[in-house]
Amino acid sequence: MSYQGKKNIPRITSERLLIKGGRIVNDDQSFYADIYMEDGLIKQIGDNLIVPGGVKTIEANGKMVIPGGIDVHTHLQMPYRGMTTVDDFLQGTKAALAGGTTMIVDHVIPEPEASLTEAFEKWREWADGKTCCDYSLHVDITHWSDSVKQEVETLVKQKGVNSFMVYMAYKDLYQMSNTELYEIFTFLGSLGAIAQVHAENGDIIAQEQNRMLELGITGPEGHVLSRPEELEAEAVFRAITIASQTNCPLYVTKVMSKSSVDLISQARKKGYVVFGEPITASLGTDGTHYWSKNWAKAAAFVTSPPLSPDPTTPDYINSLLASGDLQVTGSAHATFSTAQKAIGKDNFTLIPEGTNGIEERMSVIWDKSVATGKMDENQFVSVTSTNAAKIFNLYPRKGRIAVGSDSDLVIWDPDAVKIVSAKSHHSAAEYNIFEGMELRGAPLVVICQGKIMMEDGTLHVTQGTGRFIHCSPFPDYVYKRIKARTKMAELHGVPRGMYDGPVYDLASTPKAGTPAGSTKGSPTKQTPPVRNLHHSAFSLAGNQGDESGVRSASRRIVAPPGGRSNITSLS
């Protein structure tokens, strides 16, 4: 059977499933109940459910049943300098499902000056034929013009896209000026879309890269040395400032440093509508590996912004994720082979950027945050699924276990322990940046669209069964505050009369001359004129010799607060 009229794309056959004896964990509550699913939807939740015959029953045995994970940042089948990442939409979504993720949001990256709409359709074609789980798409704005503006509007209103990423780095390629950021944020806010930013100071990075190469530093360590965390933090602050001025919600992707986390946290405490997205790599490892003697290993960690060389950073980011200062997690999964990375063996600026993390994301967060007592199981659901669904207007279809929601579920075993290895992971990448790491917490059963996709470590997937999920504009979770602030922030001029006093004539001022009464040296304080009280014209009676008229000693001026409308006259 075809899917939505598309040829050669199979439609998934949903099973009638009953999960018994599980502990349902949503972002706001946990409780024991059974779940019945049919036609890809959750039909019943409760005890002693009455279900039709022929139902497949899964015994959860008291294990947690959580909403399927949503990975909000992936780069599958991404073109790069004539190459493509080794994980396409088939291999990448297989790895996602193996880790407990049932939906991804991938990034469309148009070439500079290329059509955003055409790039979007190209990504749709690639994904529709290969994905094994549901997906949506962000679209990156790689240049800005009136025609791009029209395309953005079309994508929002007709194509199901509600988020767009702009770059503050990659000078002379994707980097936007402050003026362009202001215009883009203003326009996205009017459409009800979400502005995402890759936050780094591209101008300074370009200078620092040249400096490193001049110093003879050509290896992967040059990548992090040319991109200190201050350059990420500066761009984060600038993006927050511009977004605030335009009253546009801001989503900071790939939060990698303590400084950036702190800025996002402070902005949220001040009431700014800003969201921060740490990724699997920044939550699970650090940038000390850039100095590895093994070039291939060091290159595997190259991504931008870079991982912090401060080894205490992952724990710090996990703490702020647990406290709510950061809200959502992605993987930024973009995998290249060692041979592909090696095109930059003599110049670190040419190393393709990207790390793995789509399969490890949920286990890394459980191990680093839940198993350590930083967050509870409900917060875990929030940062791996629910908050993402709310931000991108997918909730409660996604991100919640409730009647009517999609039957994307995971039976999660908090006691499972696995050792990460490139030999056993489902990615096509030959190196795993979490190699040898022992992680607590793993999925036992993964259900997507009401079908068992993974059970007992074995995948049961069908290529091309993933659906494109439309993301509507103006998500309440994001825009309720924006709308209220728009009403409160209406600006009005001060009502006043026309100024009818003298106006200085600039045309009469010599162009190259020095203004009268001043010198070309340092400015000096002018001494104000002082009336000589011994001058013969001075009188205590109130009538002065240098005044043309007689004034009353106690005349009172009556005027409304702020003065009369004619500001050149007091009478």
Swiss-Prot record:
Principal location listed in the UniProt entry: cytoplasm
Region Disordered, annotated ranges: 509-571
Compartment(s): Cytoplasm; Cell projection, Growth cone
GO molecular function: hydrolase activity, acting on carbon-nitrogen (but not peptide) bonds, in cyclic amides
InterPro entries cross-referenced by the UniProt entry: Amidohydro-rel, Hydantoinase/dihydroPyrase, Metal-dep_hydrolase_composite, Metal_Hydrolase, Metallo-dep_Hydrolases_sf
Gene Ontology biological-process entries: actin crosslink formation
Biased composition (Polar residues): 516-529
SUPFAM superfamilies: Composite domain of metallo-dependent hydrolases (SSF51338), Metallo-dependent hydrolases (SSF51556)
Keywords: Cell projection, Cytoplasm
Family to which the UniProt record says this protein belongs: Belongs to the metallo-dependent hydrolases superfamily. Hydantoinase/dihydropyrimidinase family.
NCBIfam families: D-hydantoinase (TIGR02033)
Assembly and binders: Homotetramer and heterotetramer.
Alphabetical list of PANTHER family matching this protein: DIHYDROPYRIMIDINASE-RELATED PROTEIN 3, HYDRANTOINASE/DIHYDROPYRIMIDINASE FAMILY MEMBER
Protein name stated in the entry: Dihydropyrimidinase-related protein 3-A
Biological source species: Xenopus laevis (African clawed frog)
Gene name linked to the record: dpysl3-a
